[in-house]
Amino acid sequence: MKKKFFERVYSISKEDVEKVEEYFFDKGISNYYFYETKEGVFLVLVSEKKNFEENFSYKLVEERETSSDEWIKNLISKPFEFIDGVYIDPDYHEINDKLVIRITPGLAFGTGLHTTTKLAATLLKKYLRQGMDVLDLGCGSGILSILAKKLGASGVLAVDNDKMAVESAIENVEKNNVEVEIRVSDLLKNVDGKYDLIVSNIIADVLVKALEDMPKFLKKNGIVILSGIIDSKLYLFEHLNIVEHRRKDEWNALVIKF
């Protein structure tokens, strides 16, 4: 029996879209999207909770029960270009001569739609070299781990503190026929070994905490890709040895070396 969720549609102003995105990212909420009609901008949000957060004050215009499969299939029912030369496909469409990531519909982070995921993936594609060992810290759906493996990484370890995300990552890794080790871990607590590249797409305050121990898990000349940094939190990283800085909308991604 498929698990039921609550789908809500809210009316919001264009000016509040970025504010809502930041709020959801800080809360770890990714199961939403926006659409626009002549009547205005609408937010579609799916939650396991019958009553969403009390301080979410936008006007509710519609509510219904749905399943996780149903709503995300509606959202990403066709292949789309994730980053340059890389496509995401929720099914098994024929996409010739392209690198394709198959994502099973679910409510874990990382459908490939969020700006922070795209920034992290773009930098991963640029800096990953054949045979590198990669750690995906806060792996969500496993999208970055799968990309790393398809780009030629040797070993990939994916960790997340959310069991639901880990289950989703396992399913997606199997769907893509790649080898990725996946574990439940609160940041780096259940991580061992050393890596040529660490990629982490999580909120800024958690990234700061993780940075304290990251050098222990890096090989010589290893690099770190950090994404999920909102403009207002960028100052927390200005003291680091930043090799590259990319920005889109209000989101930032950094490549750093220790």
UniProtKB/Swiss-Prot annotation:
Binding, S-adenosyl-L-methionine: T117, G138, D160, N201
Entry's Gene Ontology BP terms: methylation
Job of this protein: Methylates ribosomal protein L11.
Gene that this sequence comes from: prmA
Localisation per UniProt entry: Cytoplasm
Protein name as it appears in the record: Ribosomal protein L11 methyltransferase
A Gene Ontology term for the protein's cellular component: cytoplasm
Alphabetical list of Gene3D superfamilies matching this protein: Vaccinia Virus protein VP39 (3.40.50.150)
Transmembrane segment boundaries: none
Catalytic reactions on record: L-lysyl-[protein] + 3 S-adenosyl-L-methionine = N(6),N(6),N(6)-trimethyl-L-lysyl-[protein] + 3 S-adenosyl-L-homocysteine + 3 H(+)
Pfam families per record: PrmA
Single GO MF descriptor: protein-lysine N-methyltransferase activity
Organism: Thermosipho melanesiensis (strain DSM 12029 / CIP 104789 / BI429)
Protein keywords: Cytoplasm, Methyltransferase, S-adenosyl-L-methionine, Transferase
Record-listed E.C. numbers: 2.1.1.-
Domain of life: Bacteria
InterPro entries with a match to the protein in the record: Ribosomal_L11_MeTrfase_PrmA, Ribosomal_PrmA_MeTrfase, SAM-dependent_MTases_sf
Protein family (similarity comment): Belongs to the methyltransferase superfamily. PrmA family.
